[in-house]
Each structure stands twice: as C-alpha cells, then as structure tokens.
Amino acid sequence: MSDPRERIPPGNSGEETIGEAFEWLNRTVEEINREAVNHLPRELIFQVWQRSWEYWHDEQGMSQSYTKYRYLCLIQKALFMHCKKGCRCLGEGHGAGGWRPGPPPPPPPGLA
C-alpha cells in the first residue's frame, strides 16, 4: 500500500515554498489595503493594523508573518461584512459614517 500523504512536487524545496508563501502574504496584504480604502474608513484600517501589531506581535510575541496573516483575516472579514450589507461605495459613495472630514491618517506602516 502506498503512502497516502501528499508529497512535495519534484524540483521544489520546502524553503522555496515558504519564501513564496511570505511573498504571497505581503502582496495580498498590500492588495487588500488598496481595495479596503475604497470601502472602509482609513481610520478603521489604520487602527486594525496598529492593534494587530500591538497585540499579536508585541504582546503575544508572534512573528511578523503571523501578525500580517491575522490582520489580513480581520480586514477580509470587515470587507465581507461591508459587502454583505449592500456595498454602494463605488457607485453612490459612502453614506453616513463613511469617510470623516479632514485629512486622512497615514496608511498602515510599510503599506503606502
């Protein structure tokens, strides 16, 4: 009987796969941030980013990649809930509680 576990394809090492995963994570965080600013208040995006780093990285001692992953999950959930409630941002603009007047806060560090 053959081993039913999945095998790494020939020519791929675990190191290359991990490096590709980190590149994917960084690309995905940047892409979701570019989309999120079209739907969510910048203040919310910044606060989620900042709190993710404070909690997961600083308080819990998790890695940068894990912290980015948790941030990605939270922003993805926020976008899902926003769209589920009937997104009209791109067609009609934000309603009450969308963008606040005044200059926007800075984007999440390293994701400008």
Curated annotation (Swiss-Prot):
Chief location of this protein within or outside the cell: virion
Key word Transmembrane present: no
Location of this chain's protein in the cell: Virion; Host nucleus
GO biological process: symbiont-mediated suppression of host innate immune response; viral life cycle
GO cellular component: host cell nucleus; virion component
Keyword hit for Ribosomal protein: no
One matching Pfam family: VPR
Assigned keywords, A-Z: Host nucleus, Host-virus interaction, Inhibition of host innate immune response by virus, Viral immunoevasion, Virion
Motif mapping: Nuclear localization signal: 65-72
Function: Plays a role in nuclear translocation of the viral pre-integration complex (PIC), thus is required for the virus to infect non-dividing cells. Targets specific host proteins for degradation by the 26S proteasome. Acts by associating with the cellular CUL4A-DDB1 E3 ligase complex through direct interaction with host VPRPB/DCAF-1. This change in the E3 ligase substrate specificity results in the degradation of host SAMHD1. In turn, SAMHD1 depletion allows viral replication in host myeloid cells by preventing SAMHD1-mediated hydrolysis of intracellular dNTPs necessary for reverse transcription.
Complex formation: Interacts with the P6 region of unprocessed GAG. Interacts with host VPRBP/DCAF1, leading to change substrate specificity of the CUL4A-DDB1 E3 ligase complex.
Family note: Belongs to the lentivirus VPX protein family.
Extra remark beyond the main annotation: This is a macaque isolate.
Protein name per its UniProtKB record: Protein Vpx
Gene name per UniProt: vpx
